[in-house]
Curated annotation (Swiss-Prot):
It is found in: Secreted. Its main location: secreted. It comes from Apis mellifera (Honeybee). Pfam families: CUB, Trypsin. The lineage of its organism: Eukaryota, Metazoa, Ecdysozoa, Arthropoda, Hexapoda. This is Venom serine protease 34.
Length: 405
C-alpha cells in the first residue's frame, strides 16, 4: 500500500501486490520502507525506530473498504503509541459488522464512530481491520521514562573452572536462588531482571508459603560462607504468578509457567551481582540451533545428589517441529533444548536459559527452566520469555530494563 501525507491524494491510493512496497511518508525528512508479509493477503510488517512515524489506513481511503481482512504488525525497541483520528464502522454490541482490533498484551475490538489513543506495554502492536469500514491512524515509538539504551545487563565474569560443570565463583551475576528460610539449600532457581524483580517458574512457588521464602543473590556454594562476599538474602515483598498458569497433571507439563518475585529492598548491582538482559530485540526468535547455558543447584542426576555448588551445562535449542514431537501444542509459548547426557534436573526449575548475543556478548534470559523427563533422556521444556515480554513489563511498571541487549 502506498502512503502519503497529502489527504487530497488519498483517492488515488491503490493496493499494490508486491513483496516489497516502498512507502513515501514525509514527516520532515522521514522516509522508510515497509514489507508486505504475504503478497496474497493484506498483511504488513514495520519495525520503527525512535523519531519515525508510520501512517496506516484502509485501502481506498478516504472511501470505506469492504475487501479482505488486513493486518498491520508494528515492532520497535520501545513501546508503541497508536493514535487514530478516524475510526468509522457500524456500531453494534459485539462489533461484528466491521471493526478495528488492536492487540497489545491483550486484544480490544472497536467499532462505531470514535477516535483512539493507545499505548502498548511492550515493543509490539498488531492492528487488524475487519471490513466494512474505514480508519486512519498514526503510529510512533515512544520511550518509557524507565526504558534505557545506555545501560548494562547480561555481563559474565571469567571462570577459573576448566572442563567441569561447576560454575566459577559469581561467574553468572544474574543467577538467583529461591530458598525456604528454615532450611538450607535452594528449592528453585531464579534470574535477576531488575533491581527489585527476579523471574522464576510459577510451579516453584504456587504451593509454597511465600512468607517463609527468600531470594538469594550472589551465591555460589550454599554450604559455605567464605567463598564469596557477594551473597545477600532478600525478603519477598510481592509475588506475581501468571493468571493462566496451569499444569497437565498426567504428564507434569507446565503451561504459562512464569512468575515474578519483588524484593523488599533494591538488589545492589556490581561486578558479582546484576541483571540478565531480556529478549526485547529477539522476542520472536526460536533460537533453534543455538547453544544455550542452563544453571542450577539441582540434582546432578535423576533422583541423584543435590549440588551445593552452582552448576552449568550447555544445551542446544531445538526447532518447534522437534519440540512438537515430544510435547505437542503445549510448546506454543515454550521451547525445548537437548544435549545427550546433559540437562537441567530436579530443583533447577525456575533458573535461566541463557543465550549469548553474538554481537554484544551479553547474556539474554530467553527461557525459564520448567519441566523435563528423567534429566537428560529427553529434551527439556522451558517457558519462552519472549512470549511474555508484554506481561513482564505490564506487571513491573517501576522497573527499568535495558531494551538494547
Amino acid at each position: 500500500m502506498i502512503f502519503t501525507n497529502n489527504i487530497a491524494a488519498f483517492q488515488n491510493v491503490v493496493l499494490v501486490k508486491k513483496v516489497k512496497i516502498v512507502l513515501l511518508i514525509f514527516y520532515g525528512s522521514i522516509m522508510f520502507s515497509m514489507t508486505q508479509v504475504n503478497k496474497e493477503e493484506c498483511d504488513y510488517y514495520q519495525n520503527l525506530n525512535l523519531g519515525e512515524i508510520y501512517y496506516i489506513y484502509n485501502p481506498r481511503y478516504p472511501l470505506p473498504y469492504s475487501g479482505s481482512k488486513c493486518t498491520w504488525t508494528i515492532t520497535s525497541y520501545h513501546r508503541i503509541n497508536l493514535k487514530c483520528s478516524l475510526v468509522e464502522f457500524s456500531e453494534n454490541k459485539n462489533c461484528n459488522a466491521g471493526s478495528l482490533t488492536v492487540k497489545k498484551n491483550f486484544a480490544n475490538k472497536y467499532c462505531g464512530n470514535i477516535t483512539l489513543n493507545i499505548e502498548s506495554t511492550s515493543n509490539k502492536m498488531t492492528v487488524i481491520l475487519t471490513p466494512p469500514g474505514r480508519f486512519f491512524c498514526e503510529v510512533r515509538p515512544i520511550k518509557r521514562v524507565k526504558d534505557s539504551t545506555n545501560c548494562n545487563c547480561g555481563w559474565k565474569n571469567p571462570s577459573r573452572i576448566v572442563g567441569g560443570t561447576n560454575t566459577g565463583i559469581n561467574e553468572f551475576p544474574m543467577m538467583a536462588g529461591i530458598k525456604r528460610t528454615y532450611e538450607p539449600g535452594m528449592i528453585c532457581g531464579a534470574t535477576i531482571i531488575s533491581k527489585r524483580y527476579v523471574l522464576t517458574a510459577a510451579h516453584c512457588i504456587i504451593d509454597e508459603n511465600t512468607t517463609k521464602l527468600a531470594i538469594v543473590v550472589g551465591e555460589h556454594d550454599w554450604s559455605s560462607k567464605t567463598e564469596t562476599n557477594a551473597t545477600v538474602l532478600h525478603s519477598i515483598n510481592k509475588v506475581i504468578i501468571h493468571p493462566k498458569y496451569d499444569i497437565i497433571e498426567k504428564d507434569d507439563w507446565q503451561i504459562n509457567d512464569i512468575a515474578l518475585l519483588k524484593t523488599e529492598k533494591d538488589i545492589k548491582f556490581g561486578d558479582k551481582v546484576g541483571p540478565a538482559c531480556l529478549p526485547f530485540q529477539h522476542f520472536l526468535d526460536s533460537f533453534a540451533g543455538s547453544d544455550v547455558t542452563v544453571l542450577g543447584w539441582g540434582h546432578t542426576s535423576f533422583n541423584g545428589m543435590l549440588s551445593h555448588i552452582l552448576q552449568k551445562t550447555t544445551l542446544n535449542m531445538l526447532t518447534q517441529v522437534e519440540c512438537y514431537k515430544y510435547y505437542g501444542n503445549i510448546m506454543v509459548n515454550a521451547m525445548c533444548a537437548y544435549a545427550k547426557g546433559k540437562d537441567a534436573c530436579q530443583m533447577d526449575s525456575g533458573g535461566p536459559v541463557l543465550w549469548q548475543n553474538p554481537r554484544t556478548k551479553r547474556l539474554v534470559n530467553i527461557g525459564i527452566i520448567s519441566w523435563g523427563a528423567e534429566c537428560g533422556k529427553y529434551p527439556n521444556g522451558n517457558t519462552k520469555v519472549g512470549s511474555y515480554i508484554d506481561w513482564i513489563v505490564s506487571q513491573t511498571p517501576d522497573a527499568e530494563y535495558c531494551v538494547i541487549e
